[in-house]
């Protein structure tokens, strides 16, 4: 895999794909699904205030719906996003 290192206060995240079926068993085409807003952090740039943004590789996050720049790496979808567009960290 090509290594992508985000510059500045940015993250490289991989969207977590949602279920492609409805509760009734109907399979939804990609065009009918909403853009995912959950992702796993793949790489972290240089964060100035690490106490304010405690985000590490492997964390799962919720991000603003239309934030970031979508890119493809080895046929996988990723987003480069500003750390300020991260709304929450998911703890399981």
UniProtKB/Swiss-Prot annotation:
Gene3D superfamilies: GroES chaperonin. GO terms for cellular component: cytoplasm. Belongs to the GroES chaperonin family. InterPro entries: Chaperonin_GroES, Chaperonin_GroES_sf, Chaprnonin_Cpn10_CS, GroES-like_sf. Together with the chaperonin GroEL, plays an essential role in assisting protein folding. The GroEL-GroES system forms a nano-cage that allows encapsulation of the non-native substrate proteins and provides a physical environment optimized to promote and accelerate protein folding. GroES binds to the apical surface of the GroEL ring, thereby capping the opening of the GroEL channel. One of its GO terms (biological process) is chaperone cofactor-dependent protein refolding. Heptamer of 7 subunits arranged in a ring. Interacts with the chaperonin GroEL. It comes from Thermotoga neapolitana. GO terms for molecular function: ATP binding; metal ion binding; protein folding chaperone; protein-folding chaperone binding; unfolded protein binding. Its main location: cytoplasm. It is found in: Cytoplasm. It comes from the Bacteria. This is Co-chaperonin GroES. Keywords: Chaperone, Cytoplasm.
């Amino acid at each position: 895999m090509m290594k992508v290192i985000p510059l500045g206060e940015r993250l490289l995240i991989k969207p977590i794909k949602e279920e492609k079926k409805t509760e009734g068993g109907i399979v939804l085409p990609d065009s009918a699904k909403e853009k995912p807003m959950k992702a796993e952090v793949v790489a972290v740039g240089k964060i100035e205030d690490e106490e304010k943004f405690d985000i590490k590789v492997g964390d799962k996050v919720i991000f603003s719906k239309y934030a970031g720049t979508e890119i493809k790496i080895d046929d996988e979808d990723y987003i480069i996003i500003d750390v300020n567009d991260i709304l929450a960290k998911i703890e399981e």
